[in-house]
């Protein structure tokens, strides 16, 4: 018997909606990253994108434990000398609530073209409304 290898054209992708209200950031992000990769499926193949589409609502209400609301710092650099920019979790969740979850999930996905394709299947919204009703997403309880 030969080892099964999934082909990109035969992969069936489902749409799921996840409510992030009150969920811990890291635990939620790791489960979402695993589902974007397709690791929950029997036909998972590492070099093929077998994951599902994930819609996350209420990203502004995601929780962090301990003092991370004030202490967790996000860094970025402009590539110019002295161009290091920092922002705390508290300020980032007030300014761009979607970005917190997007950065957490993106860091858990592979680097390269396959990881970027997986990341594009993640849709994050700050509030309860999303514009993917036509895809008939199923509710996923994480």
Swiss-Prot record:
Entries under CDD domains matching the protein: Ribosomal_L13
GO molecular function, one term: mRNA binding
Assigned keywords, A-Z: Ribonucleoprotein, Ribosomal protein
InterPro entries: Ribosomal_uL13, Ribosomal_uL13_bac-type, Ribosomal_uL13_CS, Ribosomal_uL13_sf
Keyword Ubl conjugation assigned: no
GO terms (BP aspect): negative regulation of translation; translation
Coiled coil: none
Source organism, top-level taxon: Bacteria
GO cellular-component term (any): cytosolic large ribosomal subunit
Keyword 4Fe-4S (UniProt): no
Similarity comment: Belongs to the universal ribosomal protein uL13 family.
NCBIfam families named among the record's database cross-references: rplM_bact
The protein's assembly and partners: Part of the 50S ribosomal subunit.
Main function: This protein is one of the early assembly proteins of the 50S ribosomal subunit, although it is not seen to bind rRNA by itself. It is important during the early stages of 50S assembly.
Name of the featured protein: Large ribosomal subunit protein uL13
Source organism per UniProt: Vibrio atlanticus (strain LGP32) (Vibrio splendidus (strain Mel32))
């Amino acid at each position: 018997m030969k080892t099964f290898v999934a082909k990109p054209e035969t992969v069936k992708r489902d749409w799921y909606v996840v409510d992030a209200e009150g969920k811990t950031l890291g635990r939620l992000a790791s489960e979402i990253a695993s589902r974007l990769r397709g690791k929950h499926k029997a036909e998972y193949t590492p070099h093929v994108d077998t994951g599902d589409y994930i819609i996350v609502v209420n990203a502004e209400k995601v929780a962090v434990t301990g003092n991370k609301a004030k202490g967790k710092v996000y860094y970025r650099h402009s590539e110019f000398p002295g161009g290091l920019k920092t922002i705390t979790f508290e300020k980032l969740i007030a300014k761009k609530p979607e970005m917190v979850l997007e950065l957490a999930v993106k860091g858990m996905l592979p680097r390269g073209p396959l990881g970027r394709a997986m990341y594009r299947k993640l849709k994050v919204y700050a509030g309860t409304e999303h514009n993917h009703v036509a895809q008939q997403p199923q509710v996923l309880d994480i």
